[in-house]
Amino acid sequence: AEYGQALSSVLLLSTIDEPMQEATNINIMSAGGGIGHTEKWDTTSLSVNASYITLAPYLAIFNDRNDWEKPFEAVSGEAVFRKKFKNGLFKFYTAFDRTNFELTQEDINVPTGVTFGLKNRNVYTNMRYSGVIGDGLTLDTGASYTVAKTDVLVQENAIQDTENSAHLKVKVKKRFSSRFKLSIGAEQFLTTFEEDFSNPFFADSYGFNNHITGFFVESDIVFSRKFALKAGIRSEY
C-alpha cells in the first residue's frame, strides 16, 4: 500500500543511518578512475565520491570501424550528508552524471555513414528526516527532485528531452505492541516532460505534466513466530 505507480518512483525512507568509519578510496582503471572520501564528526558525517571514464586513450591505440567525432566520456559524482539530532536523523543525498559521445557508423545504404550522438545530463537530490515524536510514534518525511536532460542526434535529426520530477512524502507509524503497528501516509508526485524534435525540414515540440496525489494506510500484524500479516489500502488521484 505504501508504494504506488508500480514502484516506478519509489522514495525510500530507509537508508544507511551512519557510515561505519572514515575512509578514502581511490580507483584506477585503464579508461578512467575515481576517488571517494568519508569524514565523521560527533553528530554529522559527509561522504563524497567522483569518477571519470573516457575511451579516448583506448581508441587512440585500438582503432575500430567507427569514426569517433567525440569518444565516449562519462563523469559522475555524489555526496551524502547525515546529521543526528536528539530524537531523529536527517539525511541529504545528491548525485549527478554526464555522458557524451558522437560517432559515424558505416552503413551500406549511406556512403558517408550514419552519424549518431548522445548527451545525458542528470541531477538527483533527496532528503529525509526520521524521528520519534511520541510514545511509540515515529515520523518519516522525505523529498526528492530529479532533472534529466537528453540530446540525441541521428543524422540531421535532433531530439532534446527534458524531464523535471519531484516527489514529496510523509509517513507516521504507531507501534501499539510487539504484535501490531500501523502506518499512515501521503505523497505527491510532480512530473513535467518536454521534447523538441528538429531537422532541416521539420520541427515540433510536445510534452506533458503529470501530477499524482496518494494516500495509504498499512498495518503489520504478528500472530506467531511463523505467521504474520501485512495489510493495507492505497488511494491515488
Predicted regions span which residues?
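Repeated loop/turn-to-beta-strand initiation elements of outer-membrane beta-barrel proteins
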Residues: 43-46, 56, 87-90, 135-139, ...
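Signature of Gram-negative outer-membrane beta-barrel scaffolds
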Residues: 183-237
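N-terminal periplasmic accessory domains that precede
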Residues: 1-24
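Membrane-embedded beta-strand positions of outer-membrane beta-barrel proteins
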Residues: 24-28, 48-50, 92-94, 141-143, ...
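Residue-level signature of outer-membrane beta-barrel architecture
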Residues: 15, 39, 82-85, 131, ...
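Hydrophobic, lipid-facing positions within transmembrane beta-strands of outer-membrane proteins
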Residues: 9, 22, 31-35, 73-79, ...
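Transmembrane beta-strands of outer-membrane beta-barrel pores
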Residues: 15-17, 30-32, 41-43, 52-56, ...
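Flexible loop and strand-edge segments within Gram-negative outer membrane beta-barrel domains
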Residues: 55-61, 66-76, 88-165, 200-207
